[in-house]
Amino acid sequence: MTVHEAGLVRSGGRGSALRERPPRRLPWRHEPDHRTIPSPVDVTAAPPTAPDAEPRLAGDAAELRLATGNAAALWTALAETRRHPVTRRPGFLAVRGDDRAGLRVLLRTPEPTADDLVEIAALVREWTEGPVTVEDPFGGADLTGSGLTPRNLPVMIRPPAPVPAPSLRVTPVDDPERLATVERVVVSGFPLSRLQPYRPGEAFPAALLDRPGVRFLLAEVDGVPAGACLTVRAEVAGLYWMTTLPEHRSRGVGRALLHAVLAELAGSPVTLTASRAGRPLYDSLGFRPVGRATWWS
């Protein structure tokens, strides 16, 4: 089966841009303390590009690869603690969850091989257990004919820099009871609609507390849980599922969480994928875009 027959092609424009620009030296790389989160059809159209997409700068390709590596660390940790099978290839990572978690595919390179694309197409085509998400941080794979719908989200990074102290109580979570509180906040507040109604331990198994590099934070307002997030340290740090419960929004919970995250991860660059609602906060604290990912679902 060819790549076109599989319903997946590589888009030359974005991938070429990544190949042609020489990598910029990353000023923080010298720091010694970094520690390790349908049916096949022909496709010829280019992947969707948002009209307001920022141009990439020199060095963004290297930083985007680091962000992608962190996402691979996240999904590996989740898969192994949830006991979901993982397919690992140089060009992609696939997690085969249950009927609620679904199939998750993460492209790990801007230049997946023809074999990678054919295998991804087969995974998508044969999946019958629930939802499907294919995350392409590089925006170079075209799944237009795969039966999936695309959306674009910016991938951002922030170099190490001072940050104000959080204005609210934000504490790390290190026991199963408080982890369950974080899990409820994220599932209901983010929300993780696929994992509703809430089932204890489904999103965040207690085994994640023993996973190196994985950390949970809980924000409280007057002693009541108000927000939460998950971080992963690999070559860089990644922030995931930063959530404020609806009844506590517009009260500085998200900013307090982010201040706490950046303070805890001081000395390490921090990456995230930004929602439209969260983008102004990230911009205000020095995050900058390094790519525009395409998520297919």
Predicted ranges, named:
Residues 38, 108-177, 293-297:
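Acyl-donor-binding surface of acyltransferase catalytic domains
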Residues 28, 32-128, 197, 210:
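N-terminal charged segments
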Residues 175-189:
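A short, well-structured alpha-helix characteristic of acyl/acetyltransferase catalytic modules
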